[in-house]
Amino acid sequence: MTKLRKLTALLLAGALTLLLLTACSGGGGSSGPEAQAEAKVMRAINNDRANSRAAPLSNDPDMQRIAKKKLDQANLDADLNGSIGRYKFYHDVKYDKETSTLTLIAQYDYHNTKLEDLIGCITENNKASNLNFNHSSNWTKVGVAATIYNGKTYIAITLQVKTT
């Protein structure tokens, strides 16, 4: 009977140790501040798309890679020189025969940020271009990346639309 108790205790200790090691391994999805910001932006995008009865989009790996690259290459102290109201941003539009992309970088730490307002102001002068970035229901792919720089969170969003 004592051997059975010892064996049970040993098995329980081993199982708890294994559980602790797998829980702390970090092998799953990230939950750091960058990942949380990315998830919030994707939720906001998909909530807006739901209002237009458009299908939800996932954080596309190719678009996210472009967003991350733009975010890494940007001089966040100097490049965010456009401004709408109280927030500063940077944008870059790439035209292609079939699809075109818009990458937007902005500081994420302000509250009540309206992504549609930012995109609407940026694309206001591009009405002649047959591109319609300012309606989320027209987006075919989206990628979101975030970084923390000097204690502030910055996001880069790359949107893709089909040309019409």
Could you tell me what each predicted segment is?
Residues 3, 65-68, 72-73, 116-120:
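Polar/charged alpha-helical tracts
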Residues 13-16:
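Classic N-terminal secretory signal peptides
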Residues 33-95, 140-142:
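Short, well-ordered surface patches within globular domains
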Residues 88-164:
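A well-ordered secondary-structure block
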Residues 19-23:
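C-terminal motif of bacterial Sec signal peptides marking the signal peptidase cleavage site
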